[in-house]
């Protein structure tokens, strides 16, 4: 990343800071709409958010991924749904950069601002046919799909009735159906609807295997050689999920402190909450855990990127540590939000109280498969004992 790109990325962060008040004001409307408002997506486009991880050849900044995740953390601190969608849709520009140049040209050739959604869970498959794959399936949980013109869907490649590869198929909006099913308790504003694909031909250049990503043989590296595109999938994808959850924890913390500063505790003879020493203990504990979550999460991303920028390989030990700390960041954030919410009193149950929305959104984000702690901890433990990792998400 050049000094000019660094400066431009910092300018995007500054512009995002200026957007935060209006995004905060639209948080309830975003929930009610069940997807991001068009004006929010336009504002993110206008300040260059989606260019952060986009290749330079398409007008992007191909920036340090820590700056991208910092942006999503800030967005999530005022609206969980906005942070979630921006993180997921934003990282897809990094993913597309690894695809064959022909796929990049199909998506960005006429309009480099074209956005991509995804559903990576293997809820369908592609059968090998002449020149590519015949894809069928029904993929749930495609966050931000209403604002995308293409999508990635994950699944196996089937040949002679057997799976022979696994990865992502890139499909244009004209060839899949969006089913409006997103009626949920948390992350209501993400529009994470279901994508239905029926007998769609996907040419070979619009498939990318996870193996090619992991061993640095992805076709896109021939034209996009910046260090960010050599970051491990097992770091980028899970951090995309955890960064906004930590952001929600920061938002819940700010909402709690503001509320407690004005709260009079009716059950305790009119005592002001800010005069309660135990209230101060709770916020100190929460603040420490949230900061620790973020420092570990983003510190590992920065360590990996620094090695790549210096032309070095990322050791498996660091990748395993990054995965360990990623799930730990989610766990710490959820526990901190719970601690604060439980101490907020009955007024926190109001639909107008921001903390209840952060509480619901963070718990909804927690159920994402990338946040399963046991799987990540076993990877780390296996490595410590000199055993095979036992999982590919690392």
UniProtKB/Swiss-Prot annotation:
Its EC number is 1.14.14.12. InterPro entries: Acyl-CoA_dehydrogenase, Acyl-CoA_DH_C, Acyl-CoA_Oxase/DH_mid-dom_sf, AcylCo_DH-like_C, AcylCoA_DH/ox_N, AcylCoA_DH/ox_N_sf, AcylCoA_DH/oxidase_NM_dom_sf, HsaA. Induction: Induced by KstR. GO terms for molecular function: 3-hydroxy-9,10-secoandrosta-1,3,5(10)-triene-9,17-dione monooxygenase activity; acyl-CoA dehydrogenase activity; flavin adenine dinucleotide binding; oxidoreductase activity, acting on paired donors, with incorporation or reduction of molecular oxygen, reduced flavin or flavoprotein as one donor, and incorporation of one atom of oxygen. One of its GO terms (biological process) is cholesterol catabolic process. Gene3D superfamilies: Acyl-CoA dehydrogenase/oxidase, N-terminal domain, Butyryl-CoA Dehydrogenase, subunit A, domain 2, Butyryl-CoA Dehydrogenase, subunit A, domain 3. Cholesterol metabolism contributes to the survival of M.tuberculosis in the host by helping the bacterial multiplication during earlier stages of infection and to the dissemination of the pathogen in the host. NCBIfam families: monooxsub_HsaA (NF045629). This is Flavin-dependent monooxygenase, oxygenase subunit HsaA. The lineage of its organism: Bacteria, Bacillati, Actinomycetota, Actinomycetes, Mycobacteriales.
């Amino acid at each position: 990343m050049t000094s000019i790109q660094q400066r431009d990325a910092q300018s995007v962060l500054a512009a995002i800071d200026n957007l935060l008040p209006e995004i905060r004001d639209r948080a309830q409307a975003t929930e009610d709409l069940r997807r991001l408002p068009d004006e929010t997506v336009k504002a993110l486009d206008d300040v260059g958010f989606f260019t952060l991880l986009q290749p330079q050849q398409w007008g992007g900044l191909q920036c340090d991924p820590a700056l991208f995740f910092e942006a999503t953390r800030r967005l999530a601190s005022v609206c969980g749904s906005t942070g979630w969608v921006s993180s997921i849709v934003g990282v897809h520009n990094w993913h597309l950069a690894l695809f064959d140049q022909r796929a990049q040209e199909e998506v960005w050739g006429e309009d480099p601002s074209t956005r991509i959604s995804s559903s990576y869970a293997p809820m369908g498959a592609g059968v090998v046919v002449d020149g590519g794959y015949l894809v069928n399936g029904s993929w749930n949980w495609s966050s931000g799909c209403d604002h995308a013109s293409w999508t990635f869907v994950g699944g196996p490649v089937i040949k002679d009735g057997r799976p022979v590869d696994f990865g992502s198929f890139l499909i244009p909006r004209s060839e899949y159906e969006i089913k409006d099913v997103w009626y949920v308790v948390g992350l209501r504003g993400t529009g994470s609807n279901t994508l239905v694909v029926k007998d769609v031909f996907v040419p070979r250049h619009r498939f990318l295997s996870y193996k090619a990503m992991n061993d640095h043989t992805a076709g896109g590296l021939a034209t996009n050689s910046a260090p960010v595109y050599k970051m491990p999938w097992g770091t980028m994808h899970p951090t995309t999920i955890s960064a906004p959850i930590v952001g929600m924890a920061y938002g819940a913390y700010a909402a709690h402190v503001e509320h407690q500063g004005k709260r009079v505790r009716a059950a305790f003879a009119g005592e002001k909450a800010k005069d309660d020493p135990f209230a101060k203990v709770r916020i100190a504990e929460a603040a420490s855990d949230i900061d620790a979550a973020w420092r570990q999460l983003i510190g590992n991303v920065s360590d990996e990127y620094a090695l790549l920028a210096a032309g070095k390989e990322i050791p498996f030990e660091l990748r395993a540590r990054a995965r360990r700390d990623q799930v730990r960041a989610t766990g710490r954030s959820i526990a901190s939000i719970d601690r604060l919410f439980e101490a907020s009193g009955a007024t926190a149950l109001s639909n107008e109280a921001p903390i209840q929305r952060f509480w619901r959104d963070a718990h909804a984000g927690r159920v994402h498969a990338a946040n399963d702690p046991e799987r990540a901890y076993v990877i780390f433990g296996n490595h410590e004992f000199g055993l095979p990792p036992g999982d590919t998400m690392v």
